[in-house]
């Protein structure tokens, strides 16, 4: 009889009670050809420990929030103090005001902010607000950019970069996505064509300023500025989805790096310090349309709850300390440089890149440009799966998809990074 691991046993049990055995599809490890995911028992610093007591260097960080590492002592202490005073009030609390003030202080283009419970809620609310403010219905999103699982975002571009929305999940009526237009990331011609065809109907463009849901694809020079310009020319709003990049690639998010001003910004992940949270914010004149100040409805039972707000406040306090992002960037660059040098030493088709505490791994030559979702699909996805399995078996926990970015924390040590590079070097040598 086969000896099964505790993770295998738990996964089999989970599938009896939870669809697919997980509460978010990527966690099942299906996209990397694994039979079962690893069930985690606890985490500390840069490490995960599974139910079989295997230890992993974690480069997912709960998909981005754990920029301080797991179980940061200061964040835990702040949460524990708040727990004694209540978990949720269903009423306003001072922590909401304090976190809002901190976000507005640090993010260059947010004058007012509203808290929700997830990134999906944030993007849904931002789109509703943009439509109400402009009195228009159509939105533009980019192929490969993910903005949550709301019906209007579950759209693929079909056979071309320029298309009317077609749902790519059962249960999404075509009527729901008929106003979702899809363009190709880094392709201004597709954007211009959409504005020419639907000039006075487009409420907004929503974009990840750095596309972290098709690995990690940077905007080409001037792309974001051109989006800003075409929105201005057509009285449309520009929304930056910084759920992933906000407080992760820089203290002021990607918008502070590229110096482009969105009208609205969505946030999540880091601002909750590991607790469920999302937010949307922007120009005051737009945000004043949100109920109860204005007519655009948005509400949430647990929105602004004191536990999430407390975790967020302490996290932002720590990452806003002088030198934090310099140190984080050095760690990410050391990892990326080491991986690139290892691949080059064995003439292996691979390259990596990073910004702040976020990185991307591409299984193709660095001479091949990866600027779009289509480009990413042409890389060696099968080799990524082999790399993932090898690293996992040797104690390195990477994102279980070639389409996901990786994350490093301030808790990762030089030894962690060196071990990761050495393992990758061995893989490149053997393959």
From Swiss-Prot:
Alphabetized UniProt keyword annotations: Cytoplasm, Isomerase, Porphyrin biosynthesis, Pyridoxal phosphate
Record's keyword annotation contains Transcription: no
E.C. number(s) listed in UniProt: 5.4.3.8
Chain positions found as N6-(pyridoxal phosphate)lysine: 269
Biological-process GO terms, alphabetical: protoporphyrinogen IX biosynthetic process
Pathway connected to this protein: Porphyrin-containing compound metabolism; protoporphyrin-IX biosynthesis; 5-aminolevulinate from L-glutamyl-tRNA(Glu): step 2/2
Cofactor(s) the record lists: pyridoxal 5'-phosphate
Any GO MF annotation of the entry: pyridoxal phosphate binding
Superkingdom of origin organism: Bacteria
Keyword set includes Isomerase: yes
Compartments, as annotated in UniProt: Cytoplasm
GO cellular component: cytoplasm
UniProt main location, coarse: cytoplasm
HAMAP family documented for this protein: HemL_aminotrans_3 (MF_00375)
Family: Belongs to the class-III pyridoxal-phosphate-dependent aminotransferase family. HemL subfamily.
Subunit details: Homodimer.
Record-given protein name: Glutamate-1-semialdehyde 2,1-aminomutase
Source species: Francisella tularensis subsp. holarctica (strain LVS)
Taxonomic lineage: Bacteria, Pseudomonadati, Pseudomonadota, Gammaproteobacteria, Thiotrichales
């Amino acid at each position: 009889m086969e000896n099964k691991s505790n993770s295998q046993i738990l996964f089999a049990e989970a599938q009896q009670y939870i669809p697919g055995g997980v509460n978010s599809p990527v966690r099942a490890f299906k996209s990397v050809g694994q039979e079962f995911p690893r069930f985690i028992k606890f985490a500390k610093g840069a490490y995960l420990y599974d139910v079989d007591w295997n230890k992993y260097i974690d480069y997912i960080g709960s998909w981005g929030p754990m920029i301080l590492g797991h179980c940061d002592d200061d964040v835990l202490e702040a949460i524990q103090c708040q727990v004694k005073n209540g978990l949720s009030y269903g009423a306003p609390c001072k922590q909401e005001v304090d976190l809002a003030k901190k976000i507005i202080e640090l993010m260059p283009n947010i004058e007012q902010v509203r808290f929700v419970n997830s990134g999906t809620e944030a993007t849904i609310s931002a789109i509703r607000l943009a439509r109400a403010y402009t009195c228009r219905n159509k939105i533009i999103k980019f192929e490969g950019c993910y903005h949550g699982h709301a019906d209007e975002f579950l759209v693929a571009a079909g056979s071309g970069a320029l298309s009317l929305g077609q749902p790519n999940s059962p249960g999404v009526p075509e009527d729901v996505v008929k106003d979702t237009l899809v363009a190709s990331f880094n392709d201004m011609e597709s954007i211009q064509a959409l504005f020419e065809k639907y000039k006075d109907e487009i409420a907004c463009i929503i974009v990840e300023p750095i596309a972290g849901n098709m690995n990690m694809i940077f905007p080409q020079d001037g792309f974001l500025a051109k989006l800003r310009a075409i929105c201005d020319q057509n009285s449309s709003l520009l929304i930056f989805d910084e759920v992933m990049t906000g407080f992760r690639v820089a203290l002021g998010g990607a918008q502070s790096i590229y110096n482009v001003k969105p009208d609205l910004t969505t946030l999540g992940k880091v601002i909750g310090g590991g607790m469920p949270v999302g937010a949307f914010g922007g120009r005051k004149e737009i945000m004043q349309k949100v109920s109860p100040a204005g007519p655009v409805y948005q509400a949430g039972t647990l929105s602004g709850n004191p536990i999430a707000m407390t975790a967020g406040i302490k996290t932002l306090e720590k990452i806003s300390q002088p030198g934090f992002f310099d140190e984080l960037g050095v760690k990410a660059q050391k990892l990326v440089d080491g991986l690139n040098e290892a691949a080059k030493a064995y003439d292996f088709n691979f390259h990596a890149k990073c910004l702040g505490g976020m990185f991307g791994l591409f299984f193709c030559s660095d001479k091949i440009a990866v600027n779009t979702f289509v480009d990413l699909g042409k890389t060696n996805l099968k080799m990524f799966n082999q790399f993932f399995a090898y690293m996992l078996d040797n104690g390195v926990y990477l994102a279980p998809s070639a389409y996901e970015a990786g994350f490093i924390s301030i808790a990762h040590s030089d030894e962690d990074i060196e071990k990761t590079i050495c393992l990758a070097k061995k893989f490149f040598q053997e393959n």
